[in-house]
Every structure is written in structure tokens, then in C-alpha cells.
A protein has these predicted regions:
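Residue-level signal for the nucleotide or nucleotide-sugar donor/cofactor binding architecture
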Residues: 8, 34, 88, 151, ...
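Predominantly a Rossmann-like dinucleotide-binding segment in NAD(P)-dependent oxidoreductases
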Residues: 22-25, 30-120, 126, 173, ...
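C-terminal glycine/acidic-rich active-site capping loop/insertion
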Residues: 29, 126, 131, 155, ...
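Beta-strand-loop-alpha-helix segment that lines the small-molecule cofactor/substrate pocket
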Residues: 1-31, 46
Length: 266
């Protein structure tokens, strides 16, 4: 999940990396999905024009079933300085937002909730973010959304087009243009085919395990480069700085929830 539970742990990890000159790659596996990578390329190639907003939802109903049916792991039922649901889910949401748009949040507002029978934890949260270029973001993470299993959904809106990707249909990327033009791309007919690393031909869905496999393959390439040059560059492999920045954003969200105000991300 998250690289660390709080900023102090993250800084300790950085010190260990500096002392050992070590290699660190954090498993942000959702950007391993082929069509998420294709969406990123559409952003880079200007398909959407100026980006206006991104909405990401990541919700399930694991904490709102009948008591006898719920058996959550113990670590999910304890909140630290940063609520576990943020470390579990929102860390991936923040990563995807930056991965897809290339933009860094400047400030955050947050509203945390508790709806389940499990006392003392946050099990539902909204986060909103502002960005330097005027883009806005809306994030929702929840363990108490009845009817949803692991409903990761990304919606992106620009001045020229919008897009939607849903994890339960990972093969499809929907892009909507002006004049009601709607296009659906999959691994067999998408632009930027070089972004699609696949083990099965189109029609054989590349799901969750394949997304991990894509990332691990990229990490292996990055490790080979690191061993040769002492550093690595990869558009898909993220180390300490990216993971730490995500924790900084989540820490600011905690402060925002307490003060009920926008908090700048330093």
C-alpha cells in the first residue's frame, strides 16, 4: 500500500536510501493497466486540450455488509496519523491523478466520515484539490459504498474532450469529443500501441494480475539501469520522492478535515 504510514517514517526511509545508495520502487500498480497508460499518452499528445478537472472514485462495500460476513484484516481497523483508508486507497488515487495529468496539487480540502460498525476509523472520505494550471480534482474513497466491489473509476475533462476508464472494464477507454462524438478504444484498436504491453491478444482481458506484471517488468528494467548507471529513468516506475509527495498531500488532507478549510500542500 503506501510506502509508509506517516511523514516521519517516509523521511527515515529516505535516510536509509541515502546511506546505502539503494534502489526503491513503490508498487503503484494501477498505472500498470494498458488503457490507463494510453489515457496518459492522450493527455500528453493534447487530445483533451487544457485540462479542467479529474474525478477519481475508489469504493467498495467491505465494511457495510452483515457482521457475520465481514472479516477485515486487523490493520484495516486501526487509524494512525493518516487514516488507513487514505493509505490503502487514496494513495493510489493521488498517484493516478498525477500519473495521468502530470499535474501536482497545490492545496487540498477534505471531509472524512464514519458509517460502519467498526469504531474509531475513517471508512469514507472526500478530497478536493486545486492545481497550478487551474485544474480541479475530486476524489472519493470508501469502504461503505453498497453495491461496489473495488470500483476504481477515472473521469477526465478537458476543453476539447473528456475520458472515462473503469477498472471493472479494464480493456476499454472511452473518449468523448464535441458534437456528441464518442469513441471506445481497447487494446486492439487504440492509438499509442507502444504503450500496450500485453501477454494475451485482444479479446482476452488484461486484468489486475497483468497490471502488476507490467509494473514488475518495468521495475526490472529500472533495476538493471540502476545497477549500470547508479540511477534510473522510467515513466512508469516511481520511487521515494513520488511516494513521499503523495503522503504530504494526504497529511495535508488530515489537517484540512480537522480545520474544515483548504490547506496548502508544502
Amino acid at each position: 500500500k503506501a510506502m509508509a504510514a506517516d511523514l516521519q517514517q517516509s523521511i527515515a526511509i529516505q535516510k536509509a536510501l541515502d546511506d546505502t545508495k539503494g534502489f526503491l520502487a513503490v508498487t503503484f500498480n494501477y498505472s500498470g493497466y494498458p488503457m490507463v497508460r494510453v489515457l496518459r499518452r492522450h493527455v500528453q499528445e493534447g487530445t483533451f486540450g487544457e485540462l479542467k478537472q479529474i474525478q477519481i472514485e475508489f469504493h467498495s462495500d467491505g465494511f457495510i455488509q452483515a457482521p457475520e460476513k465481514m472479516h477485515p484484516q486487523a490493520w484495516r481497523l486501526v487509524d494512525g496519523a493518516i487514516p488507513t483508508i487514505l493509505l490503502d486507497l487514496a494513495v493510489h488515487v493521488q498517484h493516478l491523478s498525477e500519473f495521468i495529468t502530470g499535474q501536482i496539487p497545490l492545496s487540498v480540502n477534505a471531509d472524512f466520515h464514519h458509517f460502519s460498525i467498526f469504531d474509531g476509523i475513517v471508512d469514507d472520505a472526500y478530497l478536493w484539490a486545486k492545481f497550478e494550471k487551474g485544474m480541479r480534482a475530486s476524489y472519493w474513497v470508501s469502504k461503505t459504498a453498497l453495491g461496489h466491489r473495488n470500483g476504481l473509476r477515472v473521469r477526465l475533462f478537458g476543453e476539447q474532450a473528456s475520458a472515462e476508464w473503469y477498472q471493472e472494464e479494464p480493456e476499454r477507454l472511452h473518449i468523448y469529443g464535441k458534437d456528441s462524438v464518442r469513441m471506445t478504444y481497447d487494446r486492439g484498436n487504440c492509438y499509442f500501441k507502444e504503450e500496450v504491453r500485453e501477454r494475451f491478444k485482444p479479446g482476452h482481458p488484461a486484468g489486475f494480475v497483468e497490471a502488476f506484471a507490467n509494473l514488475y517488468n518495468d521495475i526490472a528494467d529500472a533495476l538493471v539501469m540502476f545497477r549500470k548507471k547508479g540511477q534510473f529513468q522510467s515513466p512508469y516506475v516511481f520511487g521515494w520522492q513520488h511516494a513521499h509527495d503523495g503522503l504530504v498531500m494526504l497529511d495535508a488532507a488530515v489537517q484540512s478535515n480537522k480545520t474544515e478549510t483548504w490547506v496548502e500542500i508544502n
